[in-house]
Amino acid sequence: MDSNTAPLGPSCPQPPPAPQPQARSRLNATASLEQERSERPRAPGPQAGPGPGVRDAAAPAEPQAQHTRSRERADGTGPTKGDMEIPFEEVLERAKAGDPKAQTEVGKHYLQLAGDTDEELNSCTAVDWLVLAAKQGRREAVKLLRRCLADRRGITSENEREVRQLSSETDLERAVRKAALVMYWKLNPKKKKQVAVAELLENVGQVNEHDGGAQPGPVPKSLQKQRRMLERLVSSESKNYIALDDFVEITKKYAKGVIPSSLFLQDDEDDDELAGKSPEDLPLRLKVVKYPLHAIMEIKEYLIDMASRAGMHWLSTIIPTHHINALIFFFIVSNLTIDFFAFFIPLVIFYLSFISMVICTLKVFQDSKAWENFRTLTDLLLRFEPNLDVEQAEVNFGWNHLEPYAHFLLSVFFVIFSFPIASKDCIPCSELAVITGFFTVTSYLSLSTHAEPYTRRALATEVTAGLLSLLPSMPLNWPYLKVLGQTFITVPVGHLVVLNVSVPCLLYVYLLYLFFRMAQLRNFKGTYCYLVPYLVCFMWCELSVVILLESTGLGLLRASIGYFLFLFALPILVAGLALVGVLQFARWFTSLELTKIAVTVAVCSVPLLLRWWTKASFSVVGMVKSLTRSSMVKLILVWLTAIVLFCWFYVYRSEGMKVYNSTLTWQQYGALCGPRAWKETNMARTQILCSHLEGHRVTWTGRFKYVRVTDIDNSAESAINMLPFFIGDWMRCLYGEAYPACSPGNTSTAEEELCRLKLLAKHPCHIKKFDRYKFEITVGMPFSSGADGSRSREEDDVTKDIVLRASSEFKSVLLSLRQGSLIEFSTILEGRLGSKWPVFELKAISCLNCMAQLSPTRRHVKIEHDWRSTVHGAVKFAFDFFFFPFLSAA
């Protein structure tokens, strides 16, 4: 047998039979290896050394060996490079017993042998021994593995992945690996390769036992928390058996901040609180675990209930729910206006983003509980590995749990930009002020205690600055106290920003300094460990100050004290509130037509009721539970982003072209772009030249010639026409008006005109009040009065006429005009400038010579939103939200 032969690993080739002389240590190794091949002795534990099971995890030595290795590390004793008195056989036996230092020495020995002979075989064996040592957290073995990986020595397709994984481990992960090894063998005293989860749970109590055994007296609460945490850690895997590698991987995920969700599903005191409760009082997840038979019976009853409801499915096939849904949808969409969107969209954005803020804050509270459990597990690991870098572990945890904070800040962005635009009449500012104050306090209490001096001072500074800023708007007459909140000097900083010198400004500067100090902790790693979590408290506090400015004293009393007292007075107030509610509803119904309301509600509720019947699996409890999941927040943020981008594109399109208030007269336009210019050159050249006038807002005077209706839109009529004939006539009379009867008493011109159509109409009633009209007005140039009062032929040229498009809001004034009326109108030059009969949009109109009884004398102006000033106000509010009272937008 070859004297250089190593124990064969699964990926190593057979050694060549070429003996060579070696040193005395190698002869000792040869003898031990020959004995190993012939007898195959196994050391205590699941693994003896490299061989058929070389890829398995190595078991550590007995507890006495653990203390021996600790003393060797402390005293610097044990096998070293210069210590040649210890025979290699003894080192090999230690390596087989699981000593990581001996395994490293054996790996180094075979690396030296690989330099002389059988390089591939010895290198492969050395890597196998080094892998075993690296799995126990041996730093020297990791360095040698990195060198082997770089030189491709002993690296095969079977071990390359494992070598890369061990070589890339950080010091923190190696420390966690060491602690996990000790904990695993305490949980597995029989040194099995795989242990059942139930057996591990039975041995959890042994982890907290010291060398002298269990300590007398009650178990400290910290040890109880560590024991519960360890039980959750063991039961976090779905496997029935857990091996050493599985346990180590769980702890490595912990080191990276990826904590199993089962660790934080419930509080530490849940088991004590749920003791003695009946199955009906337990949550669903605990009911399934603790009382499975009772849960199965409930599921059976639920399935029977679903089966009974499924019989209603045939009803949905008879009633055309999709058609009804489509009719309602198109009726709603066709009646939507820009005014409605300008009112509704900011409210939707505000409420959705505020709900998203609340959900993200609840997720942050959940993470604060995770922080507490995280530190409990850290303390447990520190008992077995004092070299564990706790700060680095906390940094990893904080970095991997920044998602709810990012979602929260994005939600704050939407709240800030939508609040100044949204209608305050539809926002309960007093109630929201109380809610924001509550979340300010609770978010502060959930912060880490490591930065407590800075967070406490920051919150006190922020609250003081906010209260001082509120003093000038207080209704009380405290002139000396209000001076503290007033601005003494304003210094312009550029054209857009103003620097305010005041007491709140100085406090704000100090607050920024505290932010910097929090971020500076742990070499600026405190930015996402301490500063970002505190921003949740900061944003809630700033939002409460802003909403307080829109609140009233009575509303704050109602929101803070009234609702609290309402809980105690609930039995007495129920009857009174019910009576008041009935009276209010009766008053509301008497002011409206009850039949019309009932029919509308019934039609709209049919699809909803059928959908509820067919979707019996809908769970309100599940919906409430899902609010703490990030998927709901992501969905809200995606929709908010889409809505804001859509509105932004609309505003950008409508405000992109600046309107120029031109002094251009109609006569000048006619000379440049009228028939005279066409005759001098041609119409196409004239159109190209006149395109330079695009965007001019002009106010001209002209002669009204005629107006015509170009389009009539009635979505209600379209929807009713799709219904059966008798239902359609009934709904026309319900929602519309009946044709009047022709009688000598009809004095109204409109009634007289309608009564003539009664015999010709195919329905007894009409719903023309829902009509939306689009008009086109033809306007000619005004006549110039000559000396003899004659009009030139050129002035009455119809090719100089222009056409104005008008919406339904100009209906009243347009129907009162007569041919030849002198009108003043405003429009914007755009479109087919320089052609015959250019078409412009009517912006404003007034009649100059109409009789007062036919048309009001006021000017009819098209209602248009000033989107530019709206966006400017939102941006100014957002800037002041973040920087006031230090800076404010000009």
Swiss-Prot record:
Membrane topology: Multi-pass membrane protein
Xref: InterPro entries: TPR-like_helical_dom_sf, Wolframin, Wolframin_Cys-rich, Wolframin_EF-hand, Wolframin_fam, Wolframin_OB_fold, Wolframin_Sel1-like_rpt
Primary location class: endoplasmic reticulum
Subcellular compartments: Endoplasmic reticulum membrane; Cytoplasmic vesicle, Secretory vesicle
Gene3D superfamilies linked: Tetratricopeptide repeat domain (1.25.40.10)
Annotated region (Disordered), positions in chain: 1-86
Residues annotated with N-acetylmethionine modification: M1
Annotated Pro residues bias: 10-20
Modified residues (Phosphoserine): S32, S157
Region (Interaction with ATP6V1A): 1-321
Disease: Wolfram syndrome 1: A rare disorder characterized by juvenile-onset insulin-dependent diabetes mellitus with optic atrophy. Other manifestations include diabetes insipidus, sensorineural deafness, dementia, psychiatric illnesses. Deafness, autosomal dominant, 6: A form of non-syndromic sensorineural hearing loss. Sensorineural deafness results from damage to the neural receptors of the inner ear, the nerve pathways to the brain, or the area of the brain that receives sound information. DFNA6 is a low-frequency hearing loss in which frequencies of 2000 Hz and below are predominantly affected. Many patients have tinnitus, but there are otherwise no associated features such as vertigo.
Subunit: Interacts with ATP6V1A.
Record-given protein name: Wolframin
Organism: Homo sapiens
Taxonomy of the source species: Eukaryota, Metazoa, Chordata, Craniata, Vertebrata
